Amino acid sequence: MSAHLILIDALNLIRRVYAVQERPFIQIKQDHDDELSASTLKQVLFNTQNTCVNALIKIIDQHQPTHALTVFDSQEPCWRYQLFEGYKKGRKKMPDHLANKLIDIQDAFMEQGVDSLTSDEDEADDLIATLAVKMALHGQKVTIISTDKGFLPLLSPNIHIYDYFNRRYLDEEHVQSKFSVKTSQLIDFWTLTGDNTNKIEGVSGIGQVTAAKLLNQYGSLKAILEATDLKDSLAEKLTQSLEQMDLARKLLTLKQDIPLGFNLKDIRLTTSSSAHEINANINLTTDDKS
């Protein structure tokens, strides 16, 4: 029997839950041109924590994993901000009261037998990618719980992505329907178009339709750049954007080689009686060659 690891993109879950819990009070706040009272904030945070814990329980119950981990972003800027100071520029900052509540939510997750992972240097996305790929290389199943499209390039027979809020898997069919390219072409696709969500610029004048058309015709960005039959105007745009495309690719590509320093058995669910016997010695560090 194989292992099944659930990786929860914690802030993706928590921020969405918080927004739903806060929403009923937003209009009241606007009508009175005032901040929410301390008691109201306390109730919103209490509801957020309870809803997140209930979501965790539902996820475990639905997917029946043998192992699970919630992965958090650090509150400190990651390496991508050092590479590009405009990364995620303009994105709404997490409210301090919610940021201060994260440790309590982590503790609540731990009470359910699910530990948390955070890195000061790397984003949760990089940690999740490293874990997912490591498990997949060992032939084990991974399900990533997130709505973040950045995980889509990881899709494989052993790596699945589940949107908890819309109750659906984000699969190859979803990628083709939304972007009109293959999963293996997504990084090239976003390198050309840019990623507005994270404020990553692409090639000026190339949108999703053109990018998809080029990738479907030539197969990859490398092949596009080597093509000799491009229109002069397009070839010029690409030539002028080589440096930007290199930066975009670095920002868009998730790390898969972060040293983690623990074994699969460390994150097994104690409620899974067989989990201790299932591949319990898989070393989730990058120096494991087994």
Swiss-Prot record:
Residues annotated for Mg(2+) binding in this entry: D125
Domain 5'-3' exonuclease stretches: 181-275
PANTHER family according to UniProt: 5'-3' EXONUCLEASE FAMILY PROTEIN, FLAP ENDONUCLEASE XNI
Annotated GO biological process: DNA replication, Okazaki fragment processing
Name under which the protein is recorded: Flap endonuclease Xni
SUPFAM superfamilies in alphabetical order: 5' to 3' exonuclease, C-terminal subdomain, PIN domain-like
Highest taxon above the source species: Bacteria
Function text: Has flap endonuclease activity. During DNA replication, flap endonucleases cleave the 5'-overhanging flap structure that is generated by displacement synthesis when DNA polymerase encounters the 5'-end of a downstream Okazaki fragment.
Cofactor stoichiometry and binding remark: Binds 2 Mg(2+) per subunit. Only one magnesium ion has a direct interaction with the protein, the other interactions are indirect. Binds 1 K(+) per subunit. The potassium ion strongly increases the affinity for DNA.
Stored Pfam families: 5_3_exonuc, 5_3_exonuc_N
Region Interaction with DNA: start-end pairs: 205-210
Keyword terms: DNA-binding, Endonuclease, Hydrolase, Magnesium, Metal-binding, Nuclease, Potassium
EC number per UniProt: 3.1.-.-
UniProt binding sites for K(+): L192, V203, I206
A GO MF label: potassium ion binding
Family assignment from sequence similarity: Belongs to the Xni family.
Keyword DNA-binding: yes
EC class of the enzyme, as a word: hydrolase
